[in-house]
Design a protein with these regions (language model features):
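Structural signature of nuclease core domains in nucleic-acid processing machines
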Residues: 1-225
Length: 225
């Protein structure tokens, strides 16, 4: 039947009306959007200096440092590094290998800096702040066409630390990448920080006044927004 054959051919060749929307994922993570923007993950050519001790290798040491900054009672006036590491191991927050991999000099430098002083004296501190918000696909840089640019998409993630200062929020993102300057971190992760800003402002209904990257490798910081 030629008529039937014609209709089948037309159906096969006809583009699905909502094909552009089908290409949009149901959810994204803030970190994956950052990697998509650069086209690859940030490459660590050599191990950061603070990762040169202990038996843990590679990204696991970076994870250990993030876990330490998440759970350690670093804002206590009676903070003691040795005692705190023992407590974290005893309570299961860190393994002994992770505790051994923490560079005490890097922690000391961070805690003696201006950023830490601001965090400690702030009105409120939120560590490892988890969020789940809706954003337009254009912010996630995955919009297929102009028609889908404003289509909402679910985004989730976690902010290393945020604190409230003078009624506004400040976001702090710790990075362990081996780099020559904090400017290179800003280039690679600026989009991620802007997504964090959007998420925190939605979740807490508060203005974010600053987004800061702190390099544990260099002991330096750079403001993104």
């Amino acid at each position: 039947d030629k008529e039937l054959e014609k209709k089948l051919t037309e159906n096969i060749e006809t583009k699905y009306k909502y094909q552009d929307f089908v290409a949009i994922p149901t959810k994204v993570s803030a970190s994956s959007v950052s990697h998509k923007r650069t086209g690859k993950s940030f490459i660590v050519k050599t191990k950061p200096k603070f990762m040169n001790t202990g038996k843990i290798k590679g990204a696991s040491r970076g994870t250990a440092f993030h876990e330490f900054l998440h759970y350690a009672d670093i804002f206590s006036d009676s903070f003691n590094m040795t005692a705190e590491l023992k407590r974290l191991v005893s309570n299961g927050f860190l393994s002994q290998e992770q505790a051994d991999a923490i560079d005490r000099n890097a922690v000391k430098k961070f805690m003696s800096g201006e950023l830490f002083a601001r965090m400690k004296s702030s009105e409120r501190i939120m560590r490892e702040y988890r969020f789940a918000v809706m954003i337009p696909t254009k912010l996630a840089e995955i919009a297929v066409t102009d028609e889908t640019a404003d289509t909402p998409i679910f985004m989730q993630g976690a902010i290393d630390c945020a604190f409230i200062e003078n009624g506004k929020a400040v976001i702090v993102d710790y990075k362990t990448d081996r780099i020559d300057s904090v400017e290179s971190l800003a280039e690679s992760y600026s989009k991620q920080l802007l997504l964090y800003k959007n998420a925190l402002e939605q979740s807490e209904e508060i203005e974010v006044s600053e987004c800061i990257i702190y390099s544990l490798e260099l002991g330096e910081q750079i403001r993104i927004c």
